[in-house]
UniProtKB/Swiss-Prot annotation:
One of its GO terms (molecular function) is metal ion binding. InterPro entries: AA9 (IPR049892), AA9_LPMO (IPR005103). This is AA9 family lytic polysaccharide monooxygenase AA9-X282. A motif (9res motif) lies at residues 268-275. Cu(2+) binds at H18, H96, Y182.
Length: 275
């Protein structure tokens, strides 16, 4: 009964707590929404088989392409409402706990590429870095004013890419179709002279509705959490800061936070995700 009450409360709160990825930073420089395909609304996708899972449901087109180099620090930024970048409001609220994931896909033209036809490789993720107490990837966003920072792999081939930032909210994921997927696609051009072509997956296709990281009751005690999708390209498992959330986590090799932030960053400063 207690679990049912929690789930019911989460459903009620979720109506006002949806969110979208809206802005991009490159090496600490704010690009705003200049190269993002902004979703039509902040409502989630709930099917793992719909083409909308790639870049959201009929997002607004963009003719902007942001320029990045291999090794650049890229920050995706999420907020509940369009044009509201206030740090006073949670990036995604209503107990929308779950992982944050970032994918990339090489495409011929980032402004016209169809996300559901692209081939994606994961470059960063954060799930449940602490289970005592529970501390989710979405809380990293909330503690960093909606920011999550990763590095562009240092060896990928130059050209146009889509960057897909995603949150999977698990507050009502104890039944099939309950998980909520929030994603946006950013359009970038990667420079340099790399040649790597990482292993890829299709989206949709990378997830199953019964994956243990998608069909899950997060209100039961959890000691571990399996992040959906493939392993991030070029990963390692370093020890992370031992206070206040002692744990280890799988990260993109390029970016390891040296400390756990203790305060919410002020607007205008991209935060680096905690582990």
């Amino acid at each position: 009964m207690f679990t049912k009450l929690i789930i019911a409360a989460s459903l009620a709160a979720s109506v006002a707590a949806h969110a979208t990825f809206q802005e991009l930073w490159i090496n600490g420089v704010d690009q705003g929404s200049s190269c993002v395909r902004l979703p039509q609304s902040n409502s989630p996708v709930t099917s793992v088989s719909t083409p909308d899972l790639a870049c959201n449901a009929s997002p607004h087109p963009s003719d902007g392409i942001c320029q990045v180099m291999p090794g650049d620090e890229v920050t995706v930024e999420m907020h509940q409402q369009p044009n509201d970048r206030s740090c006073a409001t949670e990036a995604i609220g209503g107990d929308h706990y779950g992982p944050v994931l970032v994918y990339m896909a090489k495409v011929d033209d980032a402004t016209t590429a169809v996300g559901s036809s692209a081939q994606w490789f994961k470059v960063a993720e954060i799930g449940l870095p602490s289970s005592n107490p529970d501390y989710w990837g979405t809380e990293v966003l909330n503690d960093n004013c909606g920011h999550y920072t990763f590095k562009v792999p240092s060896d990928i081939a130059p050209g146009n890419y889509l960057i897909r930032a995603e949150v999977i909210a698990l507050h009502v994921a104890s039944s099939i179709g309950g998980a909520q997927f929030y994603m946006s696609c950013y359009q970038v051009n990667v420079g340099g002279s790399g040649s790597a072509n990482p292993p890829t997956v299709s989206i949709p296709g990378a997830y199953s509705a019964t994956d243990p990281g998608i069909l899950i009751n997060i209100y039961e005690p959890l000691s571990t959490y399996t992040i959906p999708g493939p392993t991030p390209y070029a990963t390692t498992s370093p020890a992370v800061a031992n206070t206040p959330y002692p744990t280890t986590a799988t990260w993109n090799t390029a970016l390891q936070p040296s400390t756990v932030p203790t305060a919410v960053p002020t607007p205008g400063t991209p935060g680096i995700g905690k582990a």
